[in-house]
Protein backbone atom coordinates (compact mmCIF):
# COMPACT_ATOMS: atom_id res chain seq x y z
CA UNK A 1 0.00 0.00 0.00
CA UNK A 2 1.36 3.42 -1.00
CA UNK A 3 0.58 6.25 1.41
CA UNK A 4 0.59 9.83 0.15
CA UNK A 5 2.57 12.26 2.28
CA UNK A 6 0.07 15.02 3.01
CA UNK A 7 2.89 17.49 3.61
CA UNK A 8 4.34 16.98 0.13
CA UNK A 9 2.85 18.30 -3.12
CA UNK A 10 0.64 16.04 -5.20
CA UNK A 11 1.94 15.41 -8.70
CA UNK A 12 0.37 14.26 -11.96
CA UNK A 13 2.50 12.36 -14.47
CA UNK A 14 1.85 12.60 -18.20
CA UNK A 15 3.32 9.96 -20.49
CA UNK A 16 3.05 10.83 -24.21
CA UNK A 17 2.63 7.45 -25.93
CA UNK A 18 1.08 8.35 -29.28
CA UNK A 19 4.24 7.81 -31.34
CA UNK A 20 4.67 5.00 -33.83
CA UNK A 21 8.46 4.61 -33.63
CA UNK A 22 9.18 4.60 -37.36
CA UNK A 23 12.96 4.42 -36.86
CA UNK A 24 12.63 0.99 -35.28
CA UNK A 25 11.20 -0.38 -38.57
CA UNK A 26 8.80 -2.79 -36.89
CA UNK A 27 5.05 -3.33 -37.06
CA UNK A 28 4.29 -2.57 -33.40
CA UNK A 29 4.83 0.89 -31.84
CA UNK A 30 8.10 0.76 -29.93
CA UNK A 31 6.50 1.43 -26.53
CA UNK A 32 4.84 -1.98 -26.88
CA UNK A 33 8.00 -3.93 -27.63
CA UNK A 34 8.62 -6.45 -24.86
CA UNK A 35 11.75 -6.53 -22.70
CA UNK A 36 11.94 -9.16 -19.97
CA UNK A 37 8.34 -10.24 -20.68
CA UNK A 38 6.91 -6.75 -20.18
CA UNK A 39 6.35 -3.95 -22.64
CA UNK A 40 8.59 -0.91 -22.54
CA UNK A 41 5.57 1.18 -21.53
CA UNK A 42 4.82 -1.13 -18.60
CA UNK A 43 8.37 -0.75 -17.30
CA UNK A 44 8.07 3.03 -17.63
CA UNK A 45 4.73 3.26 -15.83
CA UNK A 46 5.79 0.90 -13.04
CA UNK A 47 8.58 3.22 -11.90
CA UNK A 48 6.25 6.22 -11.84
CA UNK A 49 3.67 4.27 -9.83
CA UNK A 50 6.27 3.64 -7.12
CA UNK A 51 6.39 7.28 -6.06
CA UNK A 52 3.78 8.05 -3.38
CA UNK A 53 3.24 11.66 -4.45
CA UNK A 54 2.40 10.84 -8.06
CA UNK A 55 -1.35 10.57 -7.54
CA UNK A 56 -2.29 9.91 -11.15
CA UNK A 57 -0.66 8.98 -14.46
CA UNK A 58 -2.19 10.16 -17.72
CA UNK A 59 -1.15 8.20 -20.80
CA UNK A 60 -1.68 10.06 -24.09
CA UNK A 61 -2.42 7.49 -26.79
CA UNK A 62 -2.66 7.45 -30.55
CA UNK A 63 -6.32 7.47 -31.58
CA UNK A 64 -5.73 4.15 -33.38
CA UNK A 65 -3.97 2.49 -30.42
CA UNK A 66 -5.17 -1.10 -30.00
CA UNK A 67 -2.54 -2.20 -27.51
CA UNK A 68 -2.72 -0.20 -24.28
CA UNK A 69 -6.01 -1.48 -22.89
CA UNK A 70 -4.85 -5.06 -23.36
CA UNK A 71 -2.12 -4.48 -20.77
CA UNK A 72 -2.99 -5.41 -17.18
CA UNK A 73 -1.37 -2.21 -15.92
CA UNK A 74 -3.98 -0.15 -17.81
CA UNK A 75 -6.57 -1.14 -15.18
CA UNK A 76 -4.55 0.40 -12.33
CA UNK A 77 -6.79 2.93 -10.60
CA UNK A 78 -4.06 5.60 -10.76
CA UNK A 79 -3.76 5.38 -14.54
CA UNK A 80 -6.08 6.95 -17.11
CA UNK A 81 -5.70 7.43 -20.85
CA UNK A 82 -6.53 10.27 -23.22
CA UNK A 83 -6.26 10.63 -26.98
CA UNK A 84 -3.03 12.38 -27.89
CA UNK A 85 -2.22 14.53 -30.90
CA UNK A 86 -0.05 14.37 -33.98
CA UNK A 87 2.86 16.01 -32.16
CA UNK A 88 4.27 15.56 -28.67
CA UNK A 89 3.17 19.03 -27.62
CA UNK A 90 -0.45 18.20 -28.48
CA UNK A 91 -0.31 14.92 -26.58
CA UNK A 92 1.03 16.62 -23.46
CA UNK A 93 -1.57 19.37 -23.69
CA UNK A 94 -4.32 16.74 -24.04
CA UNK A 95 -3.18 15.36 -20.71
CA UNK A 96 -2.92 18.75 -19.03
CA UNK A 97 -6.49 19.64 -19.98
CA UNK A 98 -7.90 16.91 -17.72
CA UNK A 99 -5.67 17.76 -14.73
CA UNK A 100 -7.58 19.19 -11.76
CA UNK A 101 -6.59 20.23 -8.24
CA UNK A 102 -2.90 19.41 -8.72
CA UNK A 103 -0.12 22.00 -8.89
CA UNK A 104 2.74 20.00 -10.40
CA UNK A 105 3.15 17.79 -13.44
CA UNK A 106 5.89 15.40 -14.53
CA UNK A 107 6.23 14.57 -18.23
CA UNK A 108 8.12 11.38 -19.01
CA UNK A 109 8.89 9.65 -22.30
CA UNK A 110 7.00 6.39 -22.77
CA UNK A 111 10.17 4.78 -24.10
CA UNK A 112 12.50 5.51 -21.19
CA UNK A 113 11.99 2.28 -19.22
CA UNK A 114 15.25 2.51 -17.26
CA UNK A 115 14.44 5.56 -15.11
CA UNK A 116 15.63 4.95 -11.56
CA UNK A 117 13.54 5.75 -8.52
CA UNK A 118 16.55 7.61 -7.15
CA UNK A 119 16.57 10.01 -10.11
CA UNK A 120 12.80 10.42 -9.92
CA UNK A 121 13.02 11.33 -6.23
CA UNK A 122 15.92 13.70 -6.87
CA UNK A 123 13.89 15.56 -9.49
CA UNK A 124 10.76 15.81 -7.35
CA UNK A 125 12.76 17.20 -4.42
CA UNK A 126 13.50 20.28 -6.55
CA UNK A 127 9.92 21.46 -6.00
CA UNK A 128 11.06 22.94 -2.69
CA UNK A 129 13.91 24.86 -4.34
CA UNK A 130 12.66 26.20 -7.66
CA UNK A 131 9.11 27.35 -8.49
CA UNK A 132 9.77 27.09 -12.24
CA UNK A 133 10.66 23.41 -12.26
CA UNK A 134 13.49 21.20 -13.45
CA UNK A 135 14.52 18.46 -15.85
CA UNK A 136 16.84 15.50 -15.65
CA UNK A 137 19.86 16.10 -17.88
CA UNK A 138 23.49 15.14 -18.42
CA UNK A 139 26.48 17.22 -19.56
CA UNK A 140 27.45 16.46 -23.15
CA UNK A 141 30.63 14.39 -23.19
CA UNK A 142 30.97 13.64 -26.90
CA UNK A 143 32.29 16.00 -29.54
CA UNK A 144 29.29 17.52 -31.33
CA UNK A 145 29.38 18.29 -35.05
CA UNK A 146 27.06 20.62 -36.93
CA UNK A 147 26.34 19.07 -40.33
CA UNK A 148 25.24 20.03 -43.79
CA UNK A 149 21.89 18.24 -43.76
CA UNK A 150 21.81 17.28 -47.45
CA UNK A 151 25.41 16.15 -47.84
CA UNK A 152 25.89 14.98 -44.23
CA UNK A 153 29.27 16.63 -43.99
CA UNK A 154 30.72 18.20 -40.83
CA UNK A 155 30.51 21.99 -41.11
CA UNK A 156 31.91 22.92 -37.69
CA UNK A 157 32.36 21.61 -34.16
CA UNK A 158 29.95 22.86 -31.50
CA UNK A 159 31.60 24.14 -28.30
CA UNK A 160 30.29 21.70 -25.70
CA UNK A 161 31.34 23.26 -22.39
CA UNK A 162 27.85 24.47 -21.46
CA UNK A 163 25.86 21.86 -23.40
CA UNK A 164 23.58 19.41 -21.63
CA UNK A 165 21.69 16.42 -22.99
CA UNK A 166 18.04 16.82 -21.96
CA UNK A 167 16.36 13.73 -20.50
CA UNK A 168 12.98 13.06 -18.94
CA UNK A 169 11.13 13.24 -16.61
CA UNK A 170 10.65 16.99 -16.73
CA UNK A 171 8.82 18.67 -13.84
CA UNK A 172 6.84 21.92 -13.96
CA UNK A 173 3.90 23.75 -12.46
CA UNK A 174 0.73 22.65 -14.25
CA UNK A 175 -0.61 26.08 -15.19
CA UNK A 176 2.81 27.39 -16.19
CA UNK A 177 3.44 24.50 -18.56
CA UNK A 178 -0.07 24.66 -19.96
CA UNK A 179 0.23 28.38 -20.73
CA UNK A 180 3.68 27.97 -22.30
CA UNK A 181 2.54 25.12 -24.53
CA UNK A 182 -0.47 27.12 -25.69
CA UNK A 183 1.79 30.04 -26.59
CA UNK A 184 4.10 27.72 -28.52
CA UNK A 185 1.16 26.45 -30.55
CA UNK A 186 -0.19 29.96 -31.12
CA UNK A 187 3.20 31.24 -32.29
CA UNK A 188 3.76 28.11 -34.41
CA UNK A 189 7.10 27.35 -32.78
CA UNK A 190 8.60 23.86 -33.07
CA UNK A 191 9.89 22.32 -29.81
CA UNK A 192 11.02 18.82 -28.93
CA UNK A 193 10.53 18.89 -25.17
CA UNK A 194 8.55 20.75 -22.52
CA UNK A 195 11.55 22.67 -21.19
CA UNK A 196 11.95 24.27 -24.62
CA UNK A 197 8.46 25.73 -24.30
CA UNK A 198 9.33 27.30 -20.95
CA UNK A 199 12.61 28.64 -22.30
CA UNK A 200 10.76 30.27 -25.19
CA UNK A 201 8.49 32.00 -22.68
CA UNK A 202 11.42 33.32 -20.65
CA UNK A 203 11.68 30.71 -17.88
CA UNK A 204 14.79 28.74 -16.93
CA UNK A 205 14.23 25.26 -15.46
CA UNK A 206 16.96 23.75 -13.32
CA UNK A 207 19.16 21.01 -14.76
CA UNK A 208 19.31 18.00 -12.44
CA UNK A 209 22.02 15.43 -13.11
CA UNK A 210 20.44 12.16 -14.22
CA UNK A 211 21.83 8.69 -14.77
CA UNK A 212 23.36 7.67 -18.10
CA UNK A 213 21.24 4.52 -17.84
CA UNK A 214 18.06 6.54 -18.39
CA UNK A 215 18.17 5.84 -22.12
CA UNK A 216 15.48 6.59 -24.68
CA UNK A 217 14.64 3.62 -26.90
CA UNK A 218 15.10 5.01 -30.41
CA UNK A 219 17.21 2.54 -32.38
CA UNK A 220 17.20 -1.29 -32.39
CA UNK A 221 20.53 -1.42 -30.55
CA UNK A 222 18.97 0.53 -27.65
CA UNK A 223 16.84 -2.53 -26.90
CA UNK A 224 19.95 -4.59 -26.16
CA UNK A 225 21.23 -2.05 -23.64
CA UNK A 226 17.84 -1.60 -21.97
CA UNK A 227 17.46 -5.36 -21.69
CA UNK A 228 20.86 -5.56 -19.99
CA UNK A 229 19.97 -2.88 -17.44
CA UNK A 230 16.54 -4.33 -16.65
CA UNK A 231 17.64 -7.96 -16.62
CA UNK A 232 20.49 -7.31 -14.21
CA UNK A 233 18.57 -4.89 -11.98
CA UNK A 234 21.33 -2.31 -12.15
CA UNK A 235 19.24 0.78 -12.86
CA UNK A 236 19.67 2.15 -9.33
CA UNK A 237 23.30 1.09 -8.91
Swiss-Prot record:
<dbReference type="GO" id="GO:0019288">
    <property type="term" value="P:isopentenyl diphosphate biosynthetic process, methylerythritol 4-phosphate pathway"/>
</dbReference>
<dbReference type="GO" id="GO:0050518">
    <property type="term" value="F:2-C-methyl-D-erythritol 4-phosphate cytidylyltransferase activity"/>
</dbReference>
<keyword id="KW-0414">Isoprene biosynthesis</keyword>
<keyword id="KW-0548">Nucleotidyltransferase</keyword>
<feature type="site" description="Positions MEP for the nucleophilic attack">
    <location>
        <position position="160"/>
    </location>
</feature>
<comment type="function">
    <text>Catalyzes the formation of 4-diphosphocytidyl-2-C-methyl-D-erythritol from CTP and 2-C-methyl-D-erythritol 4-phosphate (MEP).</text>
</comment>
<protein>
    <recommendedName>
        <fullName>2-C-methyl-D-erythritol 4-phosphate cytidylyltransferase</fullName>
        <ecNumber>2.7.7.60</ecNumber>
    </recommendedName>
</protein>
<dbReference type="InterPro" id="IPR018294">
    <property type="entry name" value="ISPD_synthase_CS"/>
</dbReference>
<dbReference type="InterPro" id="IPR034683">
    <property type="entry name" value="IspD/TarI"/>
</dbReference>
<feature type="site" description="Transition state stabilizer">
    <location>
        <position position="23"/>
    </location>
</feature>
<dbReference type="Pfam" id="PF01128">
    <property type="entry name" value="IspD"/>
</dbReference>
<keyword id="KW-0808">Transferase</keyword>
<dbReference type="InterPro" id="IPR029044">
    <property type="entry name" value="Nucleotide-diphossugar_trans"/>
</dbReference>
<comment type="similarity">
    <text>Belongs to the IspD/TarI cytidylyltransferase family. IspD subfamily.</text>
</comment>
<feature type="site" description="Positions MEP for the nucleophilic attack">
    <location>
        <position position="216"/>
    </location>
</feature>
<dbReference type="InterPro" id="IPR001228">
    <property type="entry name" value="IspD"/>
</dbReference>
<feature type="site" description="Transition state stabilizer">
    <location>
        <position position="30"/>
    </location>
</feature>
<comment type="pathway">
    <text>Isoprenoid biosynthesis; isopentenyl diphosphate biosynthesis via DXP pathway; isopentenyl diphosphate from 1-deoxy-D-xylulose 5-phosphate: step 2/6.</text>
</comment>
<dbReference type="InterPro" id="IPR050088">
    <property type="entry name" value="IspD/TarI_cytidylyltransf_bact"/>
</dbReference>
<comment type="subunit">
    <text>Homodimer.</text>
</comment>
Amino acid sequence: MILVNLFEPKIIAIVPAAGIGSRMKIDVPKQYIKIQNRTILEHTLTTLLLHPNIVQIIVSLNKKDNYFHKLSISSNFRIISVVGGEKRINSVLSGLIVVKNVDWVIVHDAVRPCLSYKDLEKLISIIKKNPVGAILARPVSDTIKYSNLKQKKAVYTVYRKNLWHALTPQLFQVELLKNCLKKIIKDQISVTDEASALEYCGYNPLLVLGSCRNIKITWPEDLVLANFYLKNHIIDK
